Amino acid sequence: MLCLTRLRANVNKVAFMEMVKDLRFRTEAPIAECGAALKETHGDVEKAMEVLRKKGAARAMKKRSRVTEHGSVVACVGGLFGAAVITVCSETDFAARSAQFQNTCARVKDALQRKIIDSKGDVLTNPMEAHRSLVEATAEDIRSSIAVLGENVTIKSVESLRLAPHVAEHISIGSYTHGSLDVPDVGRIAGVVAVSRLDPTREVQASTLTDVARHFVASSGAEGNYAHQNFFGTEETVGQWLKHHGLCFSSSLVVDFGKEPITHTASQPRNAVKHPEG
């Protein structure tokens, strides 16, 4: 009888640990908190998830006033409709480099990407409104990240790529991120770039767009006319390289975490027709 009782106890313990494992996988909450939530709800996983969600929300409220000075920038391209760079912050560099934080950044990017595509780019016309909308849409993800990391996480800003008005047709957009860890588009420096195809019927290779964005990330601190700089890794100027690839530059945006954005916009041609006033 004693052996049977012990066997049942061991079986129950194994089953409980499996529930803890499942709950941790679904919520990413600490193991101890998962176990406590399951005990509180008498083994009801769904109710335990609600308990953890409420605790995470309460913890997030307490941590929102903490200063966030570390983090990552995220390149976000919404197809042909536009692009932006998002800055996501944490309290420590240790947290910013964690898989939890990096994956949260990726989910934030996905949320903005959907908004860009669904609105056909209209969401980016007002960066402050885009930021507010993104914060609202990702509130649950941010709260979950705060609960797991144990420190504050914020979406600091959304910087929009603005096209040159006179180079806004047949646009292709690319991105490049420097200092990435294991998650694409999340790193220390992010750049997005828009180019116009000289031949509208010709598709631009994704690798070509990446090359253009990488050049502007690499030369973001350089002074002078970007068109006369040597294109990254070549002997050609930027203007020559773009023309060689059937492209015309429209605009670029580069954000180095913690610094002011650097933008370039195609200058108006000197021989552009000026319409008389009145």
Swiss-Prot record:
* Biological process per Gene Ontology, one example term: mitochondrial translational elongation
Give the matching Pfam families: EF_TS
Q: Does the keyword DNA damage apply?
A: no
Coiled coil ranges: none
The signal peptide annotation in the UniProt record is none
Question: Any keyword Membrane?
Answer: no
Cited SUPFAM superfamilies: Elongation factor Ts (EF-Ts), dimerisation domain, UBA-like
**Cellular component aspect of the GO annotation:** mitochondrion
One GO molecular function term? translation elongation factor activity
Q: Which family does it belong to?
A: Belongs to the EF-Ts family.
Task of the protein: Associates with the EF-Tu.GDP complex and induces the exchange of GDP to GTP. It remains bound to the aminoacyl-tRNA.EF-Tu.GTP complex up to the GTP hydrolysis stage on the ribosome.
Name the PANTHER family on file: ELONGATION FACTOR TS (PTHR11741), ELONGATION FACTOR TS, MITOCHONDRIAL (PTHR11741:SF0)
**Beyond the main fields, what else does the record say?**
This protein may be expected to contain an N-terminal transit peptide but none has been predicted.
Protein name per the record: Elongation factor Ts 2, mitochondrial
UniProt organism field:
Trypanosoma cruzi (strain CL Brener)
